[in-house]
Design a protein with these regions (language model features):
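Short helix-initiation/N-cap motifs at beta->coil->alpha
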Residues: 1-2, 67-79
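Long, aromatic- and glycine/proline-rich binding clefts that accommodate carbohydrate-like moieties
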Residues: 158-219, 223, 249-252
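Periplasmic solute-binding protein
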Residues: 11-40, 121-129, 190, 195, ...
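Extracytoplasmic/periplasmic substrate-recognition and gating elements
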Residues: 102-168, 199, 219
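Beta->alpha turn/N-cap motifs
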Residues: 19-22, 90-99
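Alpha-to-beta junction loops
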Residues: 11-14, 82-92
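Glycine-centered hinge/linker elements that transmit conformational signals in sensory
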Residues: 5-8, 40-70
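Bilobed periplasmic-binding protein-like "clamshell/Venus-flytrap" ligand-binding domains
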Residues: 9-20, 151-160, 244-252
Length: 252
């Protein structure tokens, strides 16, 4: 991977836009959850520390764009435009239609899907019924129609190139280029890549503290990556931020 990154740099390209782009490769590979059931201690898995080390190394080497700090901001969006020198993004399936396509201002067919460095997952789309609804049966019917009706799910996948929760349907889509190719991707059928990769995704151990830990460790170490604070200060900032958000946590 580093050899490829070095070759891309020689050609004037960044491998990825931001250190935040690679986080899920590491975060989805942790061996234990941030907080074990019944405990009040946050454990930072070695995979997360590997991300910190590699992110600093890659940023200093010029394999990532230093001007792009995190995700979901203007610089990150612009990194998807036709004037960008970013080679790839580590998106979920929904990132193509929801994020990449709206930010792209060039010709269709400039982007394509390929296998990631390793399997990972990044959230998804969810539907909820409100507690106390006056129409529980209707709510049930809507939820089942959106999550368990194969025809509906395949239509979502066809219209938005999104990976939906019908295993047999996604296997069919992977071999149906006529119906599931993407104009934005120059006629490529992304499901030919999505379906086999999804088979090997392993969900990381979860806890109720995941969102906060993931958010705060990226925020705290961003200044370290940018050279504004040293490692120890970034670590201390993370510990402080955790205890401020989760007063019940006794140790980090």
């Amino acid at each position: 991977m580093k050899e490829t990154a070095a070759q891309l740099k020689e050609k004037g390209y960044y491998t990825f836009a931001s250190y935040a782009d690679t986080f899920r490769l590491y975060g989805n590979s942790i061996a234990q959850s941030w907080v074990q059931p019944g405990e009040t201690t946050i454990t930072v898995d070695q995979k997360i520390m590997d991300w910190v080390k590699d992110s600093k190394e890659w940023l200093d080497a010029g394999y990532l764009n230093k001007t792009v700090k995190g995700q979901w901001n203007d610089d990150w969006n612009k990194a998807m435009g036709s004037q960008s020198k970013v080679f790839a993004f580590l998106f979920p399936a929904w990132g193509i239609d929801f994020t990449l396509s709206p930010n792209w201002d060039g010709d269709a067919g400039s982007w394509a899907v390929t296998n990631p460095p390793q399997e990972y997952n990044w959230g998804g789309s969810y539907i909820h019924a409100a507690t106390g609804t006056d129409n529980p049966e209707h709510a049930k019917d809507i939820i089942l129609a959106m999550t368990a009706d194969k025809d509906n799910l395949l239509k979502i996948s066809k219209d938005y190139s999104d990976f939906t929760n019908t295993k047999s349907g996604m296997a069919e889509a992977a071999t149906d280029d006529a119906n599931f190719s993407s104009e934005f991707l120059g006629g490529q059928n992304p499901f030919a890549y999505f379906a086999p990769v999804a088979e090997n995704i392993k969900i990381a151990p979860l806890s109720a503290y995941d969102q906060g830990c993931v958010e705060l460790i990226q925020n705290s170490f961003s200044d370290y990556f940018q050279g504004n604070v040293d490692f120890d200060k970034a670590k201390a900032n993370f510990e402080t931020a955790i205890k401020e958000r989760y007063p019940e946590i006794s140790e980090v």
